[in-house]
């Protein structure tokens, strides 16, 4: 299904969608905790549903209710049924975190996914699990692969600059072992706020993580406690709403906790740096259109913001440099390439660098036929760009936003955007 976008002005109020990152962690930790946990207001997108399906397959009892998921955990320690297969669809978070958990369980688990997921790098994590003693089989360092456990713990070495999800997977699974687990990072950690989010979520369930000189220590003997978790709004998804307002109107977004550890909360300060009108009042953020000025933005710790920040930069006076996000080349698409491709097709003055892009603005954008490569963030960023284009923009895959923000098009229409699916 295609998305057709025409030039529009937007205004109004909308509630931020639930956080994808928090929902993944809530489902996983509830499944590992002994007792009943309730996850309130979760995001039920394609990625988080892949995680929920996986924890069911691994032994958790799940009951779906109105705006809540009840999980009876603690059964994942039982021997796994022979031939257990986990299909993580397109979810990198699911496969990377669940692989760590599978290494601690008694039995063999096979992991697979769609074509895109099966092309994404897993080798650093698979090598780390092998170092811990897991049986690992993989033809090329990607899915499909199998993990045979259980491993007890010990010292493990892993790169920190490929995916923070590798580190989160090792951390979440560590308390299941009989020995302490020390995670040694062999390169600097990128997207550290996502690891901090994992550590914060673990703490809420009664498990502490210690920082050591080159990584993290999780002591054995800790047990996850059951907890009810309220999932807050998602700054990563709200960034598309913010940018739309900064370019084409004024909107208020509610449900965004200023104390939330999400790294993508930095989008608010980025908008201020570009010169957008920003007003924060508790959990409400109002963004209004303003003349934007160029800025240099380090996205090492907030790489998911890259596509939409590039759209903003295309409308800022002067030359902006977005950098620090080389690991974006291993996302659902090569996100640096796909971002530059769609913006250039719309008339932006933009060029790739190894770890980001250089953009000179403001550009008069024209409508174009956009290829998303099945990437939800490219779909939403290009749709926002279409709001200020001189002619109609056609986005090739309207449905891929269901991965992280299923209600994106409806929310934009509510705000007055001329968008339709066909």
Swiss-Prot record:
The keyword Transferase applies. Pathway: Metabolic intermediate biosynthesis; chorismate biosynthesis. InterPro entries: Enolpyruvate_Tfrase_dom, Enolpyruvate_Tfrase_sf, EPSP_synthase, EPSP_synthase_CS, RNA3'P_cycl/enolpyr_Trfase_a/b. Its main location: cytoplasm. 3-phosphoshikimate binds at residues 20-21, 25, 163-165, 191, 304, 331. The active site is at 304 (proton acceptor). It catalyses: 3-phosphoshikimate + phosphoenolpyruvate = 5-O-(1-carboxyvinyl)-3-phosphoshikimate + phosphate. Its EC number is 2.5.1.19. The keyword Transferase applies. One of its GO terms (cellular component) is cytoplasm. GO terms for biological process: amino acid biosynthetic process; aromatic amino acid family biosynthetic process; chorismate biosynthetic process. One of its GO terms (molecular function) is 3-phosphoshikimate 1-carboxyvinyltransferase activity. Keywords: Amino-acid biosynthesis, Aromatic amino acid biosynthesis, Cytoplasm, Transferase. Gene3D superfamilies: Enolpyruvate transferase domain. It comes from the Archaea. It is found in: Cytoplasm. Phosphoenolpyruvate binds at residues 20, 92, 120, 165, 335, 377. Belongs to the EPSP synthase family. Catalyzes the transfer of the enolpyruvyl moiety of phosphoenolpyruvate (PEP) to the 5-hydroxyl of shikimate-3-phosphate (S3P) to produce enolpyruvyl shikimate-3-phosphate and inorganic phosphate. HAMAP family: EPSP_synth. Monomer. This is 3-phosphoshikimate 1-carboxyvinyltransferase. It comes from Methanocorpusculum labreanum (strain ATCC 43576 / DSM 4855 / Z). The lineage of its organism: Archaea, Methanobacteriati, Methanobacteriota, Stenosarchaea group, Methanomicrobia.
